[in-house]
UniProtKB/Swiss-Prot annotation:
Major localisation: other
Domain Stress-response A/B barrel: 49-142, 158-252
Location within or outside the cell: Peroxisome
Gene3D superfamilies cross-referenced by the UniProt entry: 3.30.70.100
Any Pfam family the entry gives: Dabb
Protein name in the entry: Stress-response A/B barrel domain-containing protein UP3
Any one Gene Ontology cellular component term annotated for this protein: chloroplast stroma
Keyword set, alphabetical order: Peroxisome, Stress response
Length: 263
């Protein structure tokens, strides 16, 4: 029998501890921490906050409950703080990870992200629809340059999410080099509609991954066309390879039911 216990913490408004057996406990922190000061958390208007959550549903999870989880998370788009939210199954996984679903949402500021996290409706969805059917969750948050026009990728567009865990003692200059290389990908690969990258500011929930990026393509064929340029792709990877310990790369399709608002 699985039990979920919610314990408010100073550094995290909602920490979930799921007991899978008598001897195994998995700490799943889905919600962003609220230890943001007004001065340090205010985000310039030229930037947005990216929020990614990866879920691993249980092997025996009922398909109707999985669909309910997706729909209930996407329904949170009505909250004032949410600029865009999309939850969907993973289309393809290019690394050794067992995650099955992803949520991507965007906010104007860290304060808005924290307010979304603490909202009773969000708490209810996590408690009732997410925790009972998931046995692993991780999340990353980063500040990114604002995307021109609407913040919402079109339904049917394809996203490639990349998370990097860096080697120990990587200098700040190297981190800037990594983010610079990733930002420049849109110039080298015209098939990329939009791309953002940044350093994760919620390390407690990220399993050691400290740099995240998300690139959107018009459709699967556009993404595959970029992937087919192996020599150019590998040349970009070589620029940062020496700094990287491990990666998670997943792809997903934006569902037609994803919700958003324009800036």
């Amino acid at each position: 029998m699985i039990c979920a216990r919610i314990r408010p913490l100073i550094s995290s408004p909602l920490a979930f501890t799921i007991s899978t057996t008598k001897h195994s406990r998995i700490n799943l922190r889905l919600l962003p921490r609220r230890s943001f000061s007004v001065m340090s958390s205010s985000t310039p208007q030229s930037q947005i906050i990216e929020h990614i959550v990866l879920f691993k549903t249980k092997d025996d999870a009922d398909s109707t409950k999985i669909t309910s989880m997706i729909n209930n998370l996407n329904a949170l788009a009505y909250l004032d703080q949410v600029l865009h939210i999309s939850t969907s199954p993973l289309h393809r996984i290019s690394s050794a990870t067992a995650f099955t679903h992803v949520l991507h949402s965007r906010y104007e500021s860290k304060e808005d992200l924290a307010s979304y996290a603490a909202h009773p409706d969000h708490v209810r969805v996590v408690k009732e629809s997410v925790l009972p059917i998931c046995d692993d969750i991780m999340a990353v948050d980063w500040i990114a340059d604002r995307i021109p026009g609407t913040v919402a990728p079109l339904p049917g567009s394809v996203a490639k999410l990349t998370l990097l865990k860096l080697k120990e003692d990587v200098a700040d200059e190297a981190k800037s080099e990594i983010t610079g290389v990733i930002k420049g990908l849109s110039e080298k690969f015209p098939g990329i509609d939009q791309i953002t990258v940044g350093e994760n500011f919620s390390p407690a929930r990220a399993k050691g991954f400290s740099i995240a990026s998300i690139a959107y393509f018009k459709d699967l064929s556009e993404m595959e066309a970029v992937d087919a340029q192996k020599e150019l792709v590998n040349s970009q990877k070589d620029k940062v390879r020496d700094y990287v310990d491990s990666t998670i790369v997943v792809e997903f399709v934006v569902p037609s039911s994803s919700q958003s608002s324009s800036l």
